[in-house]
Amino acid sequence: FCLKDTDRVFGAHRSHSHILSLDISLHAFFSEILGRANGLSKGLGGSMHMWDKKNGFHGSVPIVSGTVPIALGSAFAAKLDGNKDIAISYMGDSAMEEGVVHETLNLASLMQLPIVFIVENNMFGSHMHISERQSSYSTARYADANNIKKIIVDGNDIIQVINAINLLSN
């Protein structure tokens, strides 16, 4: 794929697809959801608190945008270490309404950190259509505001997603 074993992925509050995109054990994944001790987080994390450090998945939390600044810290550490690792930060369109996301985007751009932000825009959040919450359907405008390279793709097309991550992480 497009990630190295040492890259780090930070999921959002609905991150089953994020962790399933990595080289994880499906048995351990489903065991976690069922609360079994042989799960990814020993059955203690459940669906919204998955963690698999061995495969580069550094967590998901039920707090909208909760892992975004943590991913930024990971990217900062990679830059300080001088390696070529990147952080992947997943979030939904509602996360774009959180102040911490704007602070993170600004700092990532200012410091030229090795991070790729993936915004899954399904046009709904908090039971509201995006038109009732934001002045534009496009969450990509926040990348423009922070001078961050962006690529808009159909998230259901895995080849487009892989190509976009490859382009943005190089």
List PLM regions with ranges.
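Cofactor-binding active-site loop characterized by glycine-rich and histidine/acidic residues
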Residues: F1-M111, H129-S135, A140-N147
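Residue-level marker for buried hydrophobic side chains located in beta-strands
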Residues: Y90, F117-I118
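Thiamine diphosphate
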Residues: V119-N170
